[in-house]
Amino acid sequence: MSLVAYDSEEEEQTSLVNENNDIKGRSEEPHWKIPNSPKAEVDTELEKKIKQFIKLKAKGIHFHTRLSENENFRNPKLLDNLQDFLDIKEPRGTMISKDMWDPTDFHKNVYASALSKSQDEMIARRENYQKHDRTEIKFQTSQHPK
């Protein structure tokens, strides 16, 4: 169903052809192609690594699967630990102009690191409360009415 009322079927067909040409860039031939191989020499170490991964894949061994099955990568704090180790800060960049949206204009408590720290503090307070205030449970004897 068209949202435009055309005077004739010919006008509608012409409009559809024009829309299709606009989508294709006003040409029947696409404007993209696979680029030529680079002229520079190939890094031999990189080529060896790629060939090794291709051999492993042919044997049914997939790098991603091996990583996901590795017990060391099941740590929920792994990303935080790696970011700390490599001194990587939280990404706060954007392609949008700052007058429209400034990603650095948030309060520090909205970022993941601050939220994680806040959660850790809450858990510590709860555990501390449970340790110190629940050392004994006081019972009262029941009294029968007379």
UniProtKB/Swiss-Prot annotation:
Where is the chain membrane-spanning? none
Please provide an example of a Pfam family that matches this protein in its UniProt record: HCNGP
Q: Which GO terms describe its biological process?
A: meiotic cell cycle; negative regulation of gene expression, epigenetic; regulation of DNA-templated transcription
Task: Spell out the InterPro entries in the cross-references.
Answer: SAP30BP
Origin, by domain of life?
Eukaryota
User: What cellular component GO annotations does this protein have?
Assistant: nucleus
Localization, UniProt = Nucleus
Q: Please provide the record's keywords in A-Z order.
A: Meiosis, Nucleus
Among its keywords, does the record have Translocase?
no
Q: Where is the sequence biased in composition, kind Basic and acidic residues? A: 21-32
Region Disordered, residue ranges: 1-40
Primary localisation category: nucleus
Function recorded in the entry = Has a role in meiosis.
Could you tell me what this protein is called?
Meiotically up-regulated gene 151 protein
Tell me what gene encodes this.
Answer: mug151
